[in-house]
Design a protein with these regions (language model features):
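Phosphate-bearing ligand-interacting subdomains
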Residues: 1-41, 45
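Structural signal for interior beta-strand "rungs" in well-ordered beta-sheet cores
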Residues: 38-142
Length: 142
């Protein structure tokens, strides 16, 4: 479907209502044999102990601390802080200036709006939608 000598591709599709276009594009690119590298902005800090899966983009001034796992094709947007031992599943969009405190789990295909703060150990179910400037003190999954 593309040039035969190109082996890498990047997906630059955001998310507010649904990650479906990004997920479908990912599946098509993988089926065509493409690798999807992970991108880190020069001003981002990513711990050497963090595990970041393919196709994820970590933008300017983000912090990703130790033992954090971020799944496939996620967007960690400008100035967000992802603390220790956080698990962000695939196809999530963490908007600008979000703080996710330690040991939280963000379910697959979730959206966390700008300026939101999640207390430590929060668990969000798949396809969660968190409005901007939310203060999350309780999990929405047991």
């Amino acid at each position: 479907i593309f040039f035969t000598k190109i082996k890498h591709a990047a997906i630059c599709i955001g998310q507010i209502k649904t990650p479906k276009p990004r997920e479908e594009t990912y599946k098509k690119l993988k089926a065509a044999g493409f690798n999807l590298p992970t991108f880190f902005a020069k001003s981002a800090y990513v711990s050497k102990n963090a595990k970041i899966d393919e196709g994820t983009i970590i933008l300017n001034k983000c912090v990703v601390n130790s033992n954090t796992k971020i799944g496939k094709c996620c967007i960690i947007n400008t100035s967000s802080v992802i603390e220790h031992d956080v698990n962000i599943k695939s196809f999530c969009h963490i908007s600008t200036s979000v703080t996710i405190n330690g040991s939280c789990t963000i379910g697959e295909k979730s959206f966390v709006g700008s300026g939101s703060v999640l207390r430590e150990s929060i668990r969000l179910k798949n396809k969660s939608f968190i409005k901007m400037k939310s203060s999350i003190k309780k999990s929405n999954i047991k």
